[in-house]
């Protein structure tokens, strides 16, 4: 009789422990979601700038595919990766449109377009501005993705180095982040980088940039670089998985 009672007590103890552990495992995902670090990420704004747009097609490959369309496609994919991690993302354009329409008799459209992008970054109070572009060269063998920064902005440089490190993981010839004198990067009030995602003058690279899966890999690398560069006061989560 005593043996039966002891076995029953042990069974009840085991059942209680199993119930408690099961409850903790069930609640763990919900407990994790309320960690303040994610809410801090939600307070971090990144401005993505798909270069060109509308009447400004940018450069193009030999088949006539325009830079503006590639820039926009990759920017949308970067936004998806960052928002998945809780980052607030603003884009200078979400469709094929220019930010400074052509006005007959008035010059300086390009500068007005850049100024409009800068103002959007400032009004959004963005921590980083990441401008996406494609490159072109008279040397058809030139290729590679490069992140540019303003040499007087250490925060922008750190962001460019972080992005470049991730880009080098997916390109055959590693490149170095480089300083550049660009009107967009020299403006005060935000930390900007320009990411050239490849040369449309290079046949192989141009073909890759037309592929959605390759665009996804580029976007993932840039998003990873942005997340790694965030201040240490914010969490650094990663998107769910790297593209195959």
Predicted stretch roles:
Residues 1-244:
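Catalytic-site microenvironment of enzymes
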């Amino acid at each position: 009789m005593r043996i039966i009672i002891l076995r029953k007590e042990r069974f009840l103890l085991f059942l209680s422990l199993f119930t408690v552990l099961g409850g903790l495992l069930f609640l763990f995902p919900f407990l994790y979601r309320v960690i303040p670090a994610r809410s801090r990420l939600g307070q971090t704004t990144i401005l993505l700038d798909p270069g060109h747009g509308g009447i400004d097609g940018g450069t193009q490959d030999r088949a006539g595919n325009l830079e503006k369309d590639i820039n926009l496609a990759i920017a949308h994919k970067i936004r998806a990766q960052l928002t998945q991690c809780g980052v607030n993302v603003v884009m200078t354009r979400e469709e094929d449109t220019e930010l400074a329409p052509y006005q007959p008799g008035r010059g300086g459209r390009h500068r007005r377009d850049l100024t409009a992008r800068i103002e959007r970054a400032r009004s959004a109070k963005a921590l980083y501005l990441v401008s996406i572009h494609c490159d072109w060269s008279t040397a058809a063998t030139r290729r590679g993705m490069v992140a540019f920064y303003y040499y007087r902005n250490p925060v922008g440089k750190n962001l460019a180095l972080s992005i470049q490190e991730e880009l080098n993981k997916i390109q055959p010839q590693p490149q170095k982040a480089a300083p550049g004198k660009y009107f967009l990067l020299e403006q005060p009030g935000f930390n900007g980088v320009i990411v050239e995602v490849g040369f449309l003058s290079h046949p192989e690279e141009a073909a890759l940039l037309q592929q959605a899966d390759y665009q996804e890999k580029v976007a993932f690398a840039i998003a990873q670089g942005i997340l790694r560069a965030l201040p240490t006061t914010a969490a650094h989560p990663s998107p769910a998985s790297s593209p195959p």
